[in-house]
From Swiss-Prot:
InterPro entries named among the record's database cross-references: Bcl-2-like_sf (IPR036834), Bcl-2_BH1-3 (IPR046371), Bcl-2_fam (IPR026298), Bcl2-like (IPR002475), Bcl2_BH1_motif_CS (IPR020717), Bcl2_BH2_motif_CS (IPR020726)
Subcellular location: Cell membrane
GN (gene name): NR13
Membrane topology: Multi-pass membrane protein
Membrane-spanning segments: 86-106, 156-176
Gene Ontology cellular component list: mitochondrial outer membrane; plasma membrane
Domain of life: Eukaryota
Protein name per the record: Anti-apoptotic protein NR13
Any single biological process term in GO: regulation of apoptotic process
SMART domains according to UniProt: BCL
Keyword Transmembrane helix recorded: yes
Expression sites (tissue/organ): Mainly expressed in neural and muscular tissues.
Species for this entry: Coturnix japonica
Organism classification: Eukaryota, Metazoa, Chordata, Craniata, Vertebrata
Amino acid sequence: MPGSLKEETALLLEDYFQHRAGGAALPPSATAAELRRAAAELERRERPFFRSCAPLARAEPREAAALLRKVAAQLETDGGLNWGRLLALVVFAGTLAAALAESACEEGPSRLAAALTAYLAEEQGEWMEEHGGWDGFCRFFGRHGSQPADQNSTLSNAIMAAAGFGIAGLAFLLVVR
């Protein structure tokens, strides 16, 4: 396991972005598997919105990291960070990274990963540590003993309750861009 929040965040985002770009590798950790699972659920529930974000990366590939930073700042002003908003931000970044990979912009996904790692581990590191780091993420979205059907329903409800304002903030920022 990585020694710091920044290292763990970088590894998780690198894995998730590779996964979103079509990499078939198994997740390297239980945390990576939980991130993939929770992200897939949010993306499935908000598919039209996230699909509408992909062209933004293709239109201005060198500006994708700056756009990600703007969205992160907007989420912060719309009520602060929570696990649902963090997940929405990761899925948004993963959408941009996958679009950049499809466009053969080789450095784009790594720039996004670096920008999001810096935001989560440095700018929001205190919040993440106070909320248990990535273990806290897994506890929030995790499966702790519930039945699979209940689990998916609980996960969906938790994501949408926590990320609701985050999705609205993303949509607003993209409209006024």
